[in-house]
Amino acid sequence: MLERSGAMLWGRTTYEMMRGYWPAVARGEIDAADAERDWAIKLDAIPKYVVSSSRTEYPWANSHRLDGDLRTAVQDLKAATPEGVLLGSVTLAAELDRLDLIDEYLFLVHPRIAGHGPTLFESGLPRTRRLDLISAQPMSNGVCVMHYRRAD
């Protein structure tokens, strides 16, 4: 997924959570499997854009604040990133869906059942969203990657 994307887009909370772990993995400061370290190095190199009204500093390599009107800023980012923008933030995903700014969805289903925490589209959507399945791929770690395109 990361190899096929030109940028990451996160909300502040997701950025802070990711920044607290992955740069240290990339630098070899945290023991991790080779596949995790490789992913961390790729994540370190890719441009990362953050939507935040409160955070002003972005010390992680290649991290930038996405400024201005959300719709316009995301449209501009998508236009400037032909490889695609990979979104990873529950709250931001719901807002971008409401603004009709998500073209495709990659859902990663992990072999775990969480008893708490945020859920995708927790606050709902204005209408049912029809999707067309592009692919479904099981990974060696038990995760299933499901790729959908908007049908409407």
Can you describe what each PLM-predicted range is?
Residues 1-152:
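Enzymes that bind and transform nitrogen-containing heteroaromatic metabolites
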